[in-house]
């Protein structure tokens, strides 16, 4: 059971985590990253993000590669990295109470995570379980 729950050990090196947060969740994302900075800084983890999330995360002192903003295709860029196997985990703090014009891209990203068996966390509790569970191995 645990083997199915955690990511394959072969992905330990060159870990690429995508981080995305809707506008109403960006502060929560920065707080989450700060709370887990020891894990993120201690391990071989590379962060990528959508554009505006990346700006906020960089201001908080994290090294991140920012892609396009979500509405301009950033979610689709991350989805492509999920599909080609270069992205190992997605942390996406969605705002389920707001409408988003790029909802089809969001749905595509989530679907591709399921298709390619990539862990996807959509809130701080599930993201903490993924990160901490991964590094307990």
Predicted features and spans:
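Mid-chain, well-packed structural core segment of small domains
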Residues: 74-110
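Short internal beta-strands
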Residues: 44-53
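Ser/Thr/Gly-rich flexible loops in soluble cytosolic domains mediating phosphotransfer, phosphorylation
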Residues: 98, 106-137
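Histidine-anchored nucleotide/phosphate-binding helix
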Residues: 29-37
């Amino acid at each position: 059971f645990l083997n199915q729950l955690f990511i394959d050990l072969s992905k330990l090196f060159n870990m690429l985590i995508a981080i995305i947060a809707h506008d109403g969740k960006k502060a929560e994302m920065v707080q989450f990253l700060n709370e887990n900075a020891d894990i993120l800084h201690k391990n071989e983890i590379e962060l990528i993000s959508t554009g505006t999330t990346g700006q906020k995360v960089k201001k908080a002192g994290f090294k991140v590669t920012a892609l396009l903003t979500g509405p301009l295709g950033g979610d689709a860029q991350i989805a492509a990295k999920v599909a080609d196997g270069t992205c190992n985990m997605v942390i996406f703090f969605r705002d389920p109470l707001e409408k988003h014009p790029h909802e089809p891209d969001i749905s595509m990203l989530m679907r591709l995570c399921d298709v390619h068996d990539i862990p996807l966390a959509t809130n701080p509790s599930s993201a903490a379980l993924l990160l901490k569970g991964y590094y307990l191995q």
